[in-house]
């Protein structure tokens, strides 16, 4: 009987963690928890603006994911490695006007940067948005034209 209770408790703990319920934050059932935030990978291809709009409609207060630390970057990379299937993925970093500084769509500040080794470029004077690529194990940022169609990750 004791073994059955222990096994049942273990299954319950695993079920809660798979449903995105972390010890420090409660997320919607199909979102994943890290620190005090929730994340969801969306496997639909959209341009950056449509992806940002989709996140906001999906859950109140949701935006494309901002990445504020190395630990958060590693967590997002792990989620994408398990769910993105060798795709490029939009995050919430964008250039609101040509040749301006980048901003996070959720309004958060810059605490961390993860630019790819070849660094940020804007050679053709167009607006850019930022993606993560499987080629860098989803750890390095790359700016591309916002009209590109990628899958994306939302954060609340």
Curated annotation (Swiss-Prot):
Chief location bin: secreted
Listed GO cellular component terms?
A: extracellular region
Stretches of the chain forming a coiled coil according to its record:
none
Keywords in UniProt for this one? Answer: Calcium, Disulfide bond, Glycoprotein, Lectin, Metal-binding, Secreted, Signal
Sequence motif Sugar-binding, location on chain:
119-121
GO MF annotation terms: carbohydrate binding; metal ion binding
Q: Where is the signal peptide?
A: 1-23
Q: Where in the cell is it found?
A: Secreted
Q: In which tissues is it expressed?
A: Expressed by the venom gland.
Entry keyword annotation includes Chaperone: no
Q: Does the keyword Protease apply?
A: no
Which InterPro entries does the entry mention?
C-type_lectin-like, C-type_lectin-like/link_sf, C-type_lectin/snaclec_domain, C-type_lectin_CS, CTDL_fold
Question: What pairs make up the disulfide bonds?
Answer: 27-38, 55-154, 129-146
Q: Where does Ca(2+) bind?
A: 142
- Record-annotated C-type lectin domain positions: 34-155
Instruction: Identify the glycosylated residues.
Output: 60, 99
The entry's function note states:
Lectin which recognizes specific carbohydrate structures and agglutinates a variety of animal cells by binding to cell-surface glycoproteins and glycolipids. May be a calcium-dependent lectin.
Per the record, the similarity remark reads: Belongs to the true venom lectin family.
Its recorded name reads C-type lectin lectoxin-Lei1
Q: Which organism is it from?
A: Leioheterodon madagascariensis
